[in-house]
C-alpha cells in the first residue's frame, strides 16, 4: 500500500480480494521505494518524495514495516492520536501519505487477525499458532498486544488451558500505551480493555 494515486477504494479492493482468497496469512507493507528505481523516480517527479530530504540511512529496506511500526509506537506512547477508520473515507479519496503506518495497522488487522475469531479448521489454527508464536518471539519481542492476544485466542481455540500469560502480556502493553489503548478500543477487543 502507498502507491502513487492509490485511493481508499483501491485499498478496500485489496482487503476484499485478500478476504475472498482466504489464505492463511498476508504480508502487508507500506511501499518503500528504493533510490535509483523507476517507482522512486516517478514519486520524486510528482512530488511525493523530496530527494533532498531523503535519508536512506533511516530506512530499513529489509523489514520496513516492523521497524516503522516500532518507531511509531514509541513516538506515540503517551499521545492520543485519532485512529483512522478505513470505511470513513470516500472510495475516491487518496491515501494520506502521512497516515500510511496507521492505515497499515488497520489493513493488517482486517486481513490477518479479524478472521481468527471464526476460524474452526484445526490445521489452519495450528499453522496460525506457530506463525503467531514466531511473530511474538522473533519479530516483535513480545511487545505487540494484538499478536499476543491472537496467539492467546488461537491457542484457546485449540484447547490449550495455558494462555493466560499471553493475555496478561497483551494487557500490559495496552495499559502502557495510549496508542495501543486507542487501537484496542477502535477494534472493540473488549478482553484487552
Q: Positions of the model-derived regions?
A:
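A structural motif corresponding to the C-terminal lobe/cap of the Radical SAM core domain
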Residues: 1-133, 137-139, 161-168, 172, ...
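A generic structural motif
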Residues: 28-31, 181-185
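Residues that mark the junctions of alpha-helical repeat units in TPR/alpha-solenoid scaffolds
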Residues: 137-146, 176, 180
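"A position-specific structural signal for the A-helix of alpha-solenoid helical repeats
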Residues: 146-150, 182-186
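C-terminal non-catalytic interaction modules
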Residues: 171, 175, 183-193
Amino acid at each position: 500500500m502507498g502507491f502513487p494515486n492509490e485511493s481508499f477504494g483501491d485499498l478496500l479492493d485489496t482487503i476484499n480480494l485478500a478476504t475472498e482468497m482466504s489464505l492463511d496469512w498476508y504480508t502487508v507493507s507500506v511501499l518503500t521505494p528504493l533510490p535509483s528505481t523507476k517507482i522512486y523516480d516517478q514519486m520524486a517527479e510528482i512530488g511525493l518524495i523530496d530527494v533532498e530530504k531523503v535519508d536512506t540511512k533511516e530506512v530499513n529496506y529489509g523489514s520496513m514495516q516492523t521497524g516503522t511500526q516500532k518507531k511509531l509506537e514509541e513516538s506515540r506512547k503517551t499521545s492520543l492520536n485519532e485512529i483512522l477508520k478505513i470505511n470513513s473515507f470516500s472510495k475516491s479519496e487518496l491515501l494520506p501519505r502521512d497516515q500510511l503506518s496507521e492505515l497499515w495497522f488497520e489493513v493488517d488487522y482486517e486481513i490477518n487477525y479479524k478472521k481468527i475469531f471464526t476460524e474452526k479448521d484445526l490445521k489452519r489454527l495450528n499453522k496460525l499458532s506457530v506463525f503467531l508464536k514466531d511473530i511474538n518471539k522473533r519479530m516483535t519481542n513480545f511487545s505487540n498486544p494484538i499478536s499476543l492476544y491472537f496467539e492467546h485466542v488461537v491457542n484457546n481455540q485449540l484447547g490449550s488451558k495455558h494462555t493466560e500469560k499471553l493475555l496478561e502480556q497483551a494487557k500490559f502493553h495496552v495499559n502502557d500505551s495510549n496508542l495501543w489503548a486507542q487501537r484496542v478500543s477502535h477494534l472493540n477487543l473488549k478482553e484487552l480493555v
